[in-house]
Amino acid sequence: LSFYKKKRKISGTMLTKDLLQKEFGKNWQKYYQVGMFKDKGYERKICKSCGRAFWTCNPEREICADSPCVEYGFINNPITKGKWDYVETWKLFEKFFEKNGHTSVPRYPVVDRWRPDLYFTIASIQDFQRVDNGNMNFVYPANPLIVPQVCLRFPDIQNVGITGKHLTSFVMSGQHAFGHPKQKGAYFKDRCLKLNFEFLNGEMGIPAEELVYQEDIWAMPDFSAFGPCMETFSQGLELVNSVFMQFQKEGDWFRDLDMRVIDVGWGHERLVWFSNGTPASYDSLFGPITGKLKKKAGVKVDPTIFDRYSKVAGSLDLGEVKDIAKAKKKVADYVGISQEELRETIEPLQAVYAIADHSRTLLFAMTDGGIPSNVGGGYNLRVVLRRALSFIDKYDLGFDLVEIAKWHADYLKPMFPELQTELDNMAKIVNAEKDKFKETRKKIKASITALVEKDTKFDDALLTQLYESQGITPEEIRKFKPDLEMPSDFYEQLTEKHSSLTEGGEGGKMIANVCATEKLCYLDEFQFDATILKIMDDNLVLDRTAFYATSGGQEHDTGTLDGIKVSDVFKQGEVILHRVEESSKFKVGQKVHGVVDRARRKQLAQNHSAVHLVNGAAREILGNHVWQAGSEVRVDKARLDITHYSAITKEQLKKIEDLVNEKIRRGIPIEKPVVERGRAEQEYGFRVYQGGAIPQKDLRIIKMGDFDVEACGGTHCNNTREIDQVKILRATKIQDGVVRLEFVAGDKANAAKEATKELHEKTLKPLSGLVCEAVLTGYSEEDMNKAAEVFSVPLVQLPITLERFIGEWGDYGDKIKAFGGEALESRVFDADRLSKVAETIFSEWKKRQKLLKDLISKRVQEEMKQLPADQPKMRGIFFGMRMKDLESDSKTPLEKTLEKVKKIAG
């Protein structure tokens, strides 16, 4: 294989990464050699240990600088000219690259809203990748640039705290240049590696002979983009990986990319660790946090023991070690202590390190709108949170995760000031999760005990099932089964399937030989003329249309074409189809006149605009973690699914509705500009992607002042006042972490309010003569809801429920009198509100119910004196059956009950 501007066909074997590595290695002068290597005296060698090619300026070096070919040489012996903490390292990096023509841009969210296939940001280049109808494009705010991108990765969670280097969150200091050679500011391999050397050698002071560059290749899974890459190592640690996106596969042909991209991922944490040389990276990465945690937990480890342990901690990588027990013994032997001593000495410290990492990960995720749940990316956040809580409980550490998160936020404020903004909201989310975990633990004790007593084999499948169905972690099982060995890849398997998602496309198959339909629906046109381009069964394809097609969760318009009813409108790709009742009356090429149903369009626009207002109001009332998780806009009602960590209370629902209607009364103009995607992201932020990533270069923005701004293709009002009013019907928790709000707007809201008033009148009917005038004449929907809550029923069931309770209340009075109790007269309830009346009725109902049971019990006990004392079984059956008979009918003869008892008792 060789790659030139001229296409060259690949024949014979299938392209693989291994094949590319071999071919790139043969032509290393073309793909890996750069000017800096010549200038600094670097030569290419093959590692005698691993066989990989590397570049060094040390003529005596015969082994590369990767581990395990060499041990870490910087531990307790850093070779940099200074020690920089987490923030200082970024400032050093930022200053150098800004001086060399790069723009420093703020980090992007760790919860990815712009890629349809990923939940979390896992690399800095991801910030600038946009998927357009299956094609990858780049959108960037500057060129070249650097970014301190926080990334979340969960496959190695079981190693965090153990190996001394693994993390669930880290900063990838991204160095990127786009579009070489056509874009201004872009550069490629020579300048990239020159900057690499100048920073590491010149700014950090790493001797040139200690910098080793190792050849590799990077490729997209489908080889849509690939190229050589150069990994920079020093003393066993990889510091940076420089990727040169240079080529692409095209069928059986290969060619240069039209524009090349520099994708350099600097390991920020590794640079910090390397310059400080602490035995475990965690002691240098989290500033004062690990010191505070150790002191608070009383964790002390002999420095000599820990130094020896840290040198071999990497061998406990649970993702690579097959026999972890054997590996632990080997480590203990190397350190010179028993396995028991190792466990008692090191494991509490490992827990402290893991908690420091996990709390920071949760802080970033929750600041950016992520919440723990049992679905999607939230699943991984719950795994992290519960692992931290399990460590706190296991070692009785007494830590407060939110307090630790605040320490992180304070320490990182110079880099990430936004972490200060969501601490209160994080506290609410974490406390709700702690309550859920506590309830889970109460329920699981019996389950685990039963499994252990049966000597159940806890294999991978069972452990996964127990976690996913009941939230039972291996750490919990170990409390009952101390010898349990957790599968080395347990958390990797759990989190892997929740790290990405597959999005289904909308609209079905593409229609061949038909141009995209011109859309008139956004112009508020309700009549139009068009030409029929194609007829498919009962569906007409027009060159232009004012009908809105079902999409984005919104129902379609209806109306007529030449007076014939249009019953459905839908999309296939960019083509819109109109289903008509009499397609035989139309022919291709015919001119038709279309009329859109104005009333339906108005109601749909009101409901859709209400969706945006409700979303904004929910975010303001509940917190910034609220994001749209789905929506549906119909004529009869709308629904909005939002991310939230608990059920929404009636009070919160009322506040949301009140805020929505306040915005309606204010008459906010609804702007609908079409904005280039990059500019929209910069101007409005990633909140515009409420409905998920949009595969278009230009976004239609629905802007309701500063209250809510979203990218949306639906039909909307022109001013919030046109929505008229919104009535929220109900809130339902549809899955863990997602709450569904159902509501109506405009005339439908008026109709719903009238229906509630009618319900109020029905509720009052059985109260006539029992309540004061204030209850009969007063009307409050909020008070009606409170009355329904008294009986734990939906509002719609309040009239029949109240009638039933009043009836039973009266029946109890008659029965009490029949069993010799005092006669209870009907009374007038003096409460001035319906909810208070409901509370009194329910309270009196319970009192009468108890009094009646006591009287019946007393009667039955008297009757039992007639039964033989030496037949306890018969007496027991009699008591239960007689109570039941008399509660049903106070006149049930004793003989009838006795007859049934004798049959049962034999």
Language-model-derived ranges and their functions:
Residues 34-43, 53-58:
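Short, flexible, mixed-charge glycine/proline-rich loop motifs
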Residues 57-72:
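Cysteine-rich micro-motifs
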Residues 391-397, 429-509:
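Extended, domain-scale alpha-helical bundle/helix-rich regions
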Residues 74-382, 392-405, 440, 709:
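Structured aminoacyl-transfer and RNA-binding surfaces used for tRNA recognition/handling
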Residues 395, 458-469, 474, 480-481, ...:
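Terminal appendage regions of diverse proteins
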Residues 499-599:
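Conserved nucleotide-binding/hydrolysis modules and their immediate coupling elements
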Residues 47-50, 64:
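Short cysteine-rich clusters marking metal-coordination/redox-active sites
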Residues 635-636, 642-735:
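Non-catalytic interaction/regulatory segments
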